[in-house]
Amino acid sequence: MTEIRNNWTKEEISAIYNSPILDLMYRGATVHREFHDPQEVQVCTLLSIKTGGCPEDCSYCPQAARYHTDVKVEKLMDVKDVLNSALEAKESGSTRFCMGAAWREVRDNKDFDKVIDMVKGVSTMGMEVCCTLGMLTPEQADKLKDAGLYAYNHNLDTSAEHYDKVITTRTYDDRLETLDNVRNAKISVCSGGIIGMGESHGDRVGMLHTLANMVEHPESVPVNALVPVEGTPLEDQPRVSVWEMVRMIATARIIMPKAMVRLSAGRVRMNTEEQALCFLAGANSIFAGDKLLTTPNPEVNADKEMFQVLNLKPRQSFKNGDAPKIKFEQIPSALVK
């Protein structure tokens, strides 16, 4: 039985990450089968509920106000429109619905009240509800938990050492503090990062080291390949190869056996064969839908065809934890189509 550890050294993780690729894939696949059904893949939908105009300077992000990209600033969506999108996601097979807002941090205002209503509404649909809204205070995390939030995404993005080369408007410790607030509120932690931002292999190991040595491993670990966007500082970064993704996914699977390892951004550039390598290495979650916030993603029909070819089946909701025990009144009919 593989031991669940929170005391990994960078040297140990580096040895795993740098092992021969076929050996690494085999080990990742073996651990994956020990803890998960290898034919099960979690299908998630990510919706941008507030787009563009972000005051931060994340070098990869087309939603930063300071960069000249094609992203148009949009205000926070209406609650009924978000709930309709959630219903459509459920009908298409998603079991987790994540709402993302281009904010630096959550503020205690009417917009946050609307997000609380969105969380309450989606939680009545039988899906895992996730948000990614920026930095959170302990009190805000508690409010989201009380509303029925299942998971909160707040990525580390990269290693502590490389972080300042990518972002300067918030610190690495700011990110870790938000994750602590989420965990203390008994909300599942979703945290991973992006590769292809000019970091070294040592930086990738460093990020995995931080994730694997948290008090509890994240419930979900998104592994993103940079999708360079014209107008951002990282627009000319070379494409991340499938083998780089396989190394990250297999290593994450080995050192965080129970986590959902999500094959996230960059999947649109992969064919079915390349995605199959990632699933074999230990990935067991994807984002479905034509967009990931503002970047392209494979079409729903293409994913359905891939599931058929690879004999994959959607994972049911709440297999990693209990559904919210709070009961809400039925969604008012005026809020949904």
Swiss-Prot record:
It holds the Pfam family Radical_SAM. Belongs to the radical SAM superfamily. Biotin synthase family. SMART domains: BATS, Elp3. GO terms for biological process: biotin biosynthetic process. NCBIfam families: bioB. Gene3D superfamilies: Aldolase class I. Binds 1 [4Fe-4S] cluster. The cluster is coordinated with 3 cysteines and an exchangeable S-adenosyl-L-methionine. Binds 1 [2Fe-2S] cluster. The cluster is coordinated with 3 cysteines and 1 arginine. It comes from Cytophaga hutchinsonii (strain ATCC 33406 / DSM 1761 / CIP 103989 / NBRC 15051 / NCIMB 9469 / D465). GO terms for molecular function: 2 iron, 2 sulfur cluster binding; 4 iron, 4 sulfur cluster binding; biotin synthase activity; iron ion binding. The keyword Transferase applies. Homodimer. It catalyses: (4R,5S)-dethiobiotin + (sulfur carrier)-SH + 2 reduced [2Fe-2S]-[ferredoxin] + 2 S-adenosyl-L-methionine = (sulfur carrier)-H + biotin + 2 5'-deoxyadenosine + 2 L-methionine + 2 oxidized [2Fe-2S]-[ferredoxin]. Pathway: Cofactor biosynthesis; biotin biosynthesis; biotin from 7,8-diaminononanoate: step 2/2. InterPro entries: Aldolase_TIM, BATS_dom, Biotin_synth/BioAB, Biotin_synthase, Elp3/MiaA/NifB-like_rSAM, rSAM. [2Fe-2S] cluster binds at residues 98, 130, 190, 262. This is Biotin synthase. [4Fe-4S] cluster binds at residues 54, 58, 61.
